[in-house]
């Protein structure tokens, strides 16, 4: 008779032994088992798990073999946004970052980590067991790729401690694995990947995890998201991550002055040239984690870190043509067509030139020979014109005077660099607005691709976003269009119907309000759970919009201008009548009228239980308007330890003053 207890113990012992061997081999580069010994133990475990699947552990190393096939990836909201980093393309910009921190803090240090050229990922563990892995996605929502990540040898399926935590890192493909993969694809007559990053990105989104397992992806982990697990410094955090079993890039350096930082970066730049994986710079972080909250963040990136980009290699090409693209706002963007050339591993045939002033400053002309590189190792850019090769009949490039779409005269405001087509009936502007409205981060109607939208626009089926939701009334017309059968049309209508339930942040972004990108939309929907409340507050109490951290005057005025336009209000009304929700999917943070509603509040001194940003957020959620300076219009002064001159001024102006204890009581009132 089979002893099931012994079988269960054997499976557990083999699992632990093999996981330990994986850690020794892939993370510590110090294998204790030979390949033959490892393979024999793995084969034994596979046989036992097949016969007794009830004893298979959720962190079994057999998961790294793959075999699970997804139909599609589900989308999951990140616990906290996966933000991008601001860039420094030279030492001057890096020095500006350093000086900004040095003005605020007399003593701090920095950690410089290699910026791995890969794919950002978030890993979540429960009681030390990996249970979820997400791509970065748009920073707020990511795709679940757990089965694929389980196949990566360096990812611990079980930590050395039974912790609940979330970590973030970068998945990458080594250069040697990339070359091997492309050799295999060449033999199989499959398209080759242009560079290791694209190969890693394409691999991690494979629906079949067996394919992922074969491609030998790697990973480095660099941060913990759980505040209660944070150490005092980033340096200590990296050491802690390594102790949990994570693969941490060993090439990080600490510095306490800008001069020292410069030296460390030079060392890292020299070192990375001999590595078997690609990097595109160094991430400089303030080492002391307790300073991060005070330093703050923008809607897009933390202010306590910056990505310093290494200089990239140049490739030579020739300017063939300069064309102008019309955006949804009417702004014209010049694009340079060049003879296709390989730049940092990918073929480049077009380079964005930003604006006409940029063309003049660089003196870019037709038929010029130019040096092309990738700014930040990502965006193709003309680094310089090779004037020694310029043709003798060359002439400076002359700005066009008419819109390339509608031929209206262009407009340029005094003091600005951009040219605009101000014809609101410009067809290209309307098409670009529709393309933006259906885009992934807006309404995400993926069945309405650019060409389909243009076809429907030319057929006069769609002119404004609201017309998209009337397509179902034109079923017969749609099915008569060449290439649009009943099934394709039904797929479009299904996607359109589904989009009606998109969150307010997506709809706001889709409306294309000037200065209101996805990040700003997300900030606004944390404070307003419907378009009606946002509109009413914008028109009646603009100061409360301005006082929201990360919004400010420019965005507030842009919102005001948008909601004052009757055509915009008419379009919003149509969209609502056609079923678009305009509601936040998160719980409303707007409170019922209370003590703080519409009160102008000023803060002074240090609070014991709140940081300045925390208390500002709480007060704004209560409906308060936060001001920096006291005036006769101020309703309330909140004081903490070591208040400044504002306290005496408030007494002189007879402004109500409350301390932290009373503040907490008022905040807790319903």
UniProtKB/Swiss-Prot annotation:
Family annotation (CDD domains): BRCT_DNA_ligase_like, LIGANc
Keywords: DNA damage, DNA repair, DNA replication, Ligase, Magnesium, Manganese, Metal-binding, NAD, Zinc
PROSITE patterns tied to this protein: BRCT, DNA_LIGASE_N1
E.C. no: 6.5.1.2
Catalytic reactions of this protein: NAD(+) + (deoxyribonucleotide)n-3'-hydroxyl + 5'-phospho-(deoxyribonucleotide)m = (deoxyribonucleotide)n+m + AMP + beta-nicotinamide D-nucleotide
GO cellular component: cytosol
Binding site for Zn(2+): 403, 406, 421, 426
Keyword flag Metal-binding: yes
Stated role: DNA ligase that catalyzes the formation of phosphodiester linkages between 5'-phosphoryl and 3'-hydroxyl groups in double-stranded DNA using NAD as a coenzyme and as the energy source for the reaction. It is essential for DNA replication and repair of damaged DNA.
The name this protein goes by in its record: DNA ligase
Organism: Phytoplasma australiense
């Amino acid at each position: 008779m089979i002893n099931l207890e012994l079988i269960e113990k054997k499976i557990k012992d083999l699992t632990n032994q093999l996981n330990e061997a994986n850690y020794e081999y892939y993370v510590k580069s110090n294998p204790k088992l030979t390949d033959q010994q490892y393979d024999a133990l793995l084969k034994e475990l596979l046989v036992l798990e097949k016969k007794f699947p009830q004893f298979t552990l959720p962190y079994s190393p057999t998961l790294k073999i793959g075999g699970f096939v997804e139909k599609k990836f589900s989308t999951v909201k990140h616990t906290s946004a996966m933000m991008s980093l601001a860039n420094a393309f030279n030492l001057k910009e890096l020095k500006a970052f350093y000086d900004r921190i040095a003005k605020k803090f007399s003593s701090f240090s920095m950690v410089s980590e290699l910026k791995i050229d890969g794919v950002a990922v978030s890993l979540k563990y429960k009681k030390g067991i990996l249970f979820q892995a997400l791509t970065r996605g748009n920073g707020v929502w990511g795709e679940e790729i757990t089965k694929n990540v389980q196949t990566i040898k360096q990812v611990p399926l079980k930590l050395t401690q039974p912790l609940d935590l979330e970590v973030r890192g970068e998945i990458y493909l080594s250069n040697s694995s990339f070359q091997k993969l492309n050799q295999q694809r060449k033999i199989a007559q499959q398209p080759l990947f242009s560079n290791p990053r694209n190969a890693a990105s394409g691999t991690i989104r494979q629906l079949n995890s067996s394919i992922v397992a074969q491609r030998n992806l790697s990973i480095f982990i660099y941060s913990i998201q759980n505040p209660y697990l944070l150490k005092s410094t980033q340096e200590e955090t990296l050491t802690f991550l390594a102790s949990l079993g994570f693969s941490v890039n060993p090439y990080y350096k600490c510095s306490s002055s800008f001069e020292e930082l410069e030296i460390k970066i030079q060392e890292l730049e020299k070192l990375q040239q001999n590595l078997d994986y690609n990097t595109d710079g160094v991430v400089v972080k303030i080492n002391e984690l307790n300073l991060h909250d005070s330093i703050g963040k923008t809607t897009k990136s933390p202010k306590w870190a910056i990505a310093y980009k290494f200089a990239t290699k140049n490739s030579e090409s020739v300017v063939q043509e300069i064309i102008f693209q019309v955006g949804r706002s009417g702004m014209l963007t010049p694009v340079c067509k060049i003879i296709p050339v390989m730049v940092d591993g990918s073929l480049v045939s077009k380079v964005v030139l930003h604006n006409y002033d940029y063309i003049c400053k660089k003196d870019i002309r037709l038929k010029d020979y130019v040096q092309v590189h990738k700014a930040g190792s990502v965006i193709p850019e003309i680094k310089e014109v090779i004037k020694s090769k310029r043709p003798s009949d060359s002439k400076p490039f002359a700005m066009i005077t008419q819109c390339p779409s509608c031929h209206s005269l262009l407009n340029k405001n005094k003091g600005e660099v951009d040219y605009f087509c101000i014809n609101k009936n410009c067809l290209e502007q309307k098409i670009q607005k529709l393309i933006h409205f259906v885009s992934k981060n807006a309404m995400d109607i993926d069945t309405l691709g650019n060409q389909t939208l243009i076809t429907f626009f030319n057929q006069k089926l769609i002119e404004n976003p609201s017309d998209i939701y009337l397509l179902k009334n034109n079923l017969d017309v749609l099915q008569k269009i060449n290439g649009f059968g009943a099934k394709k049309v039904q797929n479009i209508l299904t996607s359109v119907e589904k989009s009606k339930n998109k969150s307010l942040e997506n709809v706001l972004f889709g409306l294309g309000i000037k200065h209101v990108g996805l990040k700003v939309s997300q900030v606004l929907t944390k404070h307003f759970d419907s378009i009606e409340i946002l509109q009413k507050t914008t028109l009646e109490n603009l100061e409360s919009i301005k006082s929201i951290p990360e919004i400010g005057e420019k965005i507030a005025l842009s919102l005001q201008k948008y909601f004052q336009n009757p055509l915009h209000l008419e379009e919003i009304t149509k969209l609502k009548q056609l079923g678009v929700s305009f509601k936040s999917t998160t719980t409303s943070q707007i409170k019922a009228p209370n003590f703080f509603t519409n009160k102008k509040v000023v803060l002074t001194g240090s609070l014991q239980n709140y940081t300045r940003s925390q208390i500002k957020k709480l007060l704004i959620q209560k409906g308060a308007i936060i001001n920096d300076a006291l005036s006769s219009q101020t309703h309330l002064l909140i004081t903490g330890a070591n208040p400044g001159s504002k306290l005496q001024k408030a007494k002189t102006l007879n402004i109500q003053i409350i301390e932290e204890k009373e503040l907490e009581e008022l905040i807790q009132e319903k």
